[in-house]
Amino acid sequence: MNALVHKSLVVQLQAHGTERFPVLAHLEYDADDPFAVTVVFAHDGRVLARWKVDRGMLGEGLTKPVGVGDVRFRPVADGPSEELCMEFYGDAHADGGRQHAAVFMWASAVAAFLRETHAVVAPGEEEAGVDDFLAEVLAGS
């Protein structure tokens, strides 16, 4: 079984005060970093942003709001469709405000991607690799 999972989706980006517009989102899961999903947003062949997000939070965000920091997820019911809203917050401004952008993805597509990642590394079976790291560090000293 492949240790990498890729999925490309057309998603909707909405920056502060703008209408939604389509961009590509490339989702990647690598079993070598089992807790993370890398998401690359691109438009007109240009990378707009690259984020590494927690796989567990991504899954939880399909059913309930999660996150309190720079990245937050929440489900959105948009008529007959279910979406996942990924919200990204920038650094604070002098006035206390923050830049904010939201990305809306079909929840079913994200759920399908996560099922593929779970086939590679099941939830709860992830290993942080701390013991291996410490062994390497101690062997070098």
Please provide the spans of the model-predicted regions:
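Charge-rich, low-complexity N-terminal segments
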Residues: 1-40
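Eukaryotic intrinsically disordered, low-complexity regulatory linkers and tails enriched in Ser/Thr/Pro
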Residues: 2-8, 35-36, 44-47, 60, ...
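Charged, terminal alpha-helix-loop-beta segments
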Residues: 6, 21, 52-57, 128
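Short, surface-exposed beta-strand/loop "edge" segments at domain boundaries and coil↔beta transitions
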Residues: 18-20, 43-52, 93-101
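Coil-to-beta-strand transition motifs
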Residues: 32-35, 81, 96
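Residue-level recognition of well-ordered beta-strand positions that form the cores
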Residues: 40-42, 87
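Short, internal acidic amphipathic alpha-helical interface segments
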Residues: 49-94
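Mixed-charge, glycine-accented linear interaction segment located at domain edges/termini
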Residues: 97-141
